[in-house]
From Swiss-Prot:
One of its GO terms (cellular component) is mitochondrial intermembrane space. Belongs to the MIX23 family. Keywords: Coiled coil. The keyword Thylakoid does not apply. This is Protein MIX23. It comes from the Eukaryota. It comes from Taeniopygia guttata (Zebra finch). Residues 82-120 form a coiled coil. InterPro entries: MIX23. The keyword Nucleus does not apply.
Length: 144
């Protein structure tokens, strides 16, 4: 399996999904992260919540950008495979193995496209939690 910052293998959908699961750890742990790093009123002087929120913001942005890049790259690669298989099928109408491979790749493409929707939900949830806890400590740049 590829490293979270590296290139993903788009051949095996289960491996692709596992990579995304690992890369989504930051989003899964955001509530815990905020609860353990953003101080309550009684501990305000011991931690700089502005710095903590800024670092978390940067980590979230990097994670979201990397995952989106990987998903879109795999969609692009799989789309190219589907296109090639469709062209081959036009030449060999009766090839059952080719048709089976085409259907498999089309299914994988649909699953990868659905990961974009999952990504949107995960990101929205993370930004909602981040904004609820960090809005008074850190104002992110307007690009979000």
């Amino acid at each position: 399996m590829a490293a979270p910052g590296g290139a993903a293998s788009c051949e095996d959908f289960a491996e692709f999904q596992e990579l995304l699961r690992v890369m989504r750890t930051i989003d899964d742990r955001i509530v815990h992260e905020l609860n353990t790093t953003i101080p309550t009123a009684s501990f305000v002087g011991k931690v700089d919540p502005g710095q903590t929120c800024r670092e978390l913001y940067e980590s979230l942005m990097d994670a979201h950008t990397n995952r989106e890049r990987i998903i879109k790259n795999c969609i692009s690669q799989t789309s190219a495979v589907v296109k090639t298989l469709k062209e081959e099928r036009e030449k060999a109408h009766e090839d059952a193995a080719l048709l089976k491979q085409l259907r498999k790749e089309q299914t994988k493409l649909k699953l990868m496209q659905s990961e974009l929707n999952v990504e949107e939900v995960v990101n929205d949830r993370s930004w909602k939690v981040f904004n609820e806890r960090c809005r008074i400590h850190y104002k992110p740049p307007k690009s979000q």
